[in-house]
Amino acid sequence: MFVNLNKSLIAQRFAKARQSYVENAIAQKKISHHLCHLMQAYCPLHLSRIFEIGCGSGNLTQELFVSFQIQRAYLNDLYDEVKQHFLDEQPIEWCIGDIESLSLPEHLNAIVSSSAIQWVQNLPQLLGRCHHALNDQGWLCLSTFGSDNFKEIKQLTGQGLSYWSVQDWQVHLQASGFELMKIEQQQLKMQFDSPRAILKHLKATGVTGTVATTQPHWNKQSLAQFYHDYCQFQTDDGHYELTYHPIYIIARRTS
């Protein structure tokens, strides 16, 4: 079974986890750093108007401010509290709300997003809107996740998000009028001291929308069973693995 997304619940969980996220989102920081590195290899230095989908605590945003010449950054997220992570003097304009129902800024040089668009339910429609919002030759630079993301959790609970493959992205980007400049994927194996620490990590990063960590069937017995079953993912040195499966995309508007 795959999770039916409740956007208001997702917003509540990320808002609740906003402080612990900064400390615990180690994988997300690595992913945003690598996305910025890829952008530096392909995009021009001057990106005067950018729009970021799901800016969160600003991991990607701050890297972009350091690496590119940005005159105006339009930042989106589901909840208002993200503003506390940013400086007042930064050239930011806020677009708070669900990206699937918000109007996008126009005449953009780049649209970026790191570890956020997996929550979007109608990706083809969003790609079409991004194409319309970008200038000719504008850049679409994303990191999202593939099917092996949290595969351990999915195997044990049967719950998780439905993800596009690299091939899906290639097809849909071309259909939406983008030239794919670079696409690559990784598998990041995070290690924890216990299965309980993994559930705490997911809660601390606000991503419990992908697992049933707040569902009624999590009782003492079912948690004990989950901890027991997770032992199959124990490494030789006694740690427990959780897989992140990021996909990186650098594309350019062509028509």
UniProtKB/Swiss-Prot annotation:
Entry keyword set: Biotin biosynthesis, Methyltransferase, S-adenosyl-L-methionine, Transferase
Pfam (any one): Methyltransf_23
EC number(s) recorded for this UniProt protein: 2.1.1.197
Pathway recorded for this protein: Cofactor biosynthesis; biotin biosynthesis
Signal peptide: none
GO biological process: biotin biosynthetic process; methylation
Molecular function per GO: carboxyl-O-methyltransferase activity; malonyl-CoA methyltransferase activity
Catalysed reactions, as listed in the record: malonyl-[ACP] + S-adenosyl-L-methionine = malonyl-[ACP] methyl ester + S-adenosyl-L-homocysteine
Membership in a protein family: Belongs to the methyltransferase superfamily.
Role: Converts the free carboxyl group of a malonyl-thioester to its methyl ester by transfer of a methyl group from S-adenosyl-L-methionine (SAM). It allows to synthesize pimeloyl-ACP via the fatty acid synthetic pathway.
Entries under HAMAP family matching the protein: BioC
Protein's name according to its UniProt entry: Malonyl-[acyl-carrier protein] O-methyltransferase
Lineage of source species: Bacteria, Pseudomonadati, Pseudomonadota, Gammaproteobacteria, Moraxellales
